[in-house]
């Protein structure tokens, strides 16, 4: 049996402000730092060990991983950063308040933008200062690889090559893997692992800073999955994520 641990980053400054974040590179709040540290303490207390760690190129996930590994006294572990693990790009919604956007467009439209499988938000213009196409961290990518908006279907298409090319081979090689990423990049992985339908994925929310453990068989098919720590607290945190986009 293999294990895979997925952790959504701790609370970010724009989570606190209830803003659409996407690829905007915002930092953790003091609570987010404590959530990340607590995740590390939980993993250490439960006896988890890792051989390699993966995260995005956005600081809220990278710093979350740092705090997790620091609490585990494993800051020396190899860390792989990949743009493929970035949050879903929220296009022209990036920086906007979710509740105010819901008041303007309606709860149903914002829910579709946030949680449906194939409805992208309005795209950024390529010349919009919020666009990441001039960001040095993406210099090796083609312009088409740096999105102007994404739906979850697009995020799945971006994340899954990383599963096949990096995560799955590492797990099958016996490496103990931890991934610190984002709500929607983790939703993409969970959709694949649990074979969740396009319709049902709308109801899946990932809480900040709580380790999600997958036990996998020899074919990397899930045997079971669970959140470490208080299951009721994890459920409440996921419900809070679901309510963020309501007027």
Swiss-Prot record:
EC code: 5.4.2.11
Q: Which family does it belong to?
A: Belongs to the phosphoglycerate mutase family. BPG-dependent PGAM subfamily.
> Reaction(s) catalyzed by this protein?
(2R)-2-phosphoglycerate = (2R)-3-phosphoglycerate
Answer whether the UniProt record assigns the keyword Oxidoreductase to this protein.
no
List the Pfam families hit by this protein, alphabetically.
His_Phos_1
InterPro entries, per the entry? His_Pase_superF_clade-1, His_PPase_superfam, PG/BPGM_mutase_AS, Phosphogly_mut1
Q: Which GO terms describe its molecular function?
A: phosphoglycerate mutase activity
User: Any idea what this protein is called?
Assistant: 2,3-bisphosphoglycerate-dependent phosphoglycerate mutase
The lineage's top-level taxon is Bacteria
Catalytic center residues: 9, 87
One of the GO biological process terms: gluconeogenesis
Could you tell me which cysteines form disulfide bridges? Answer: none
Record keyword Isomerase present? yes
Q: What does this protein do?
A: Catalyzes the interconversion of 2-phosphoglycerate and 3-phosphoglycerate.
Organism of this sequence: Albidiferax ferrireducens (strain ATCC BAA-621 / DSM 15236 / T118) (Rhodoferax ferrireducens)
Keyword annotations of the record: Gluconeogenesis, Glycolysis, Isomerase
List the NCBIfam families hit by this protein, alphabetically. Answer: pgm_1, PRK14115.1
Where does the entry annotate site (Transition state stabilizer)? 182
Instruction: Write down the PANTHER family for this protein, in alphabetical order.
Output: PHOSPHOGLYCERATE MUTASE (PTHR11931)
Report the pathway entry: Carbohydrate degradation; glycolysis; pyruvate from D-glyceraldehyde 3-phosphate: step 3/5
Quaternary structure note:
Homodimer.
Binding of substrate, residues: 8-15, 21-22, 60, 87-90, 98, 114-115, 183-184
